[in-house]
């Protein structure tokens, strides 16, 4: 039996420790650089849940200190807000048998309405200065918000001036659309009081209108950045018609609802161990491949592992190659064009298909990338869903 060989690859997850890969007895074995106890595992779980992806390399040096104090202020503000809300509810008559629902609702709407009006006026007067002095106005906003909550707590002690006080408080706290909605609500509330049928009818109407308006709003957005879906749409159209869609055309074709069609999943930024399990598979992954990423098919998914410093253009190339493989692996009739050849080679084995896909992507990608840039697509800032695993193999891993 062969002894342990020298490390041939290293692997990191975000800014955590490195793992080394060795060849042992014909197998790829991963060895941790240091023992990881339960404490470090819990710490890693905490980081992955509560800190940004790639922390601390993905954020500025002041991030942790700012987030600590921002969390403290948000927590204390939340408690203060709950106290002021309780006082406001008591002031409008919650728990008082003599208070009517309509009167309480109108008082609450007046409170919010004056707040939104104040917000509109403030944005009109000081809007251009907010970006210039963001830190100053952030602090001013918090102070005014605390003053408003104090006034709301104080208001029930002065029943005769309750509405006036909460309206003034609302000016400190709180846009034109919401204000218009409140004005309409002032008309609707007396009509729906003690009328459940009209209440449900109007609720259903406004809910449908809300969802329809949201759908149309999302549909109207045109994004020039590339995500996996838009890149897949662009690549398939290019392979079939030899043309690049404009951002407007591609965004109109992009689905906005979850797609439940059967697809071959694409996993970006996987561990090396998820892609290769033996020296033979490693050699197959490197065949015809001089790129800063490794790609293959494992357990019904197209898997891609990448180096640490991979240019954005190579990220696009990796995803394009993964899309080609994913399409070629779909059951059913073989696609037309260049992907048909890929499907034919796939009958000889998955790694043969991967090797052929390297040749395919080298032929089509330069002109495809030039076309993306010519049609206004951003190729330096991407929205591709890479996991944090980074692998260095070959000479770079020594």
Which positions does each model-derived feature cover?
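Interhelical loop segments of eukaryotic multi-pass membrane proteins
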Residues: 89-107, 127-137, 141, 201-202, ...
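Transmembrane helix-loop junctions in multipass membrane proteins, especially transporters and channels
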Residues: 82, 86-94, 124-131, 157-161, ...
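Short acidic, glycine/proline-enriched loop segments that cap or flank alpha-helices
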Residues: 188-196
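Short, surface-exposed helix-loop/turn micro-motifs enriched in polar/charged residues
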Residues: 98, 132-135, 160-163, 179, ...
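Helix-loop boundary elements of multi-pass alpha-helical membrane proteins
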Residues: 52-67, 117-143, 192-193
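Hydrophobic alpha-helical cores of multi-pass transmembrane domains in eukaryotic membrane proteins
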Residues: 68-83, 105-121, 140-154, 164-188, ...
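Extended, charged interaction scaffolds in large complex subunits
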Residues: 2-9, 18-20, 198, 202-398
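Helix-loop boundary and gating motifs at the non-cytosolic
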Residues: 11, 19-119, 162
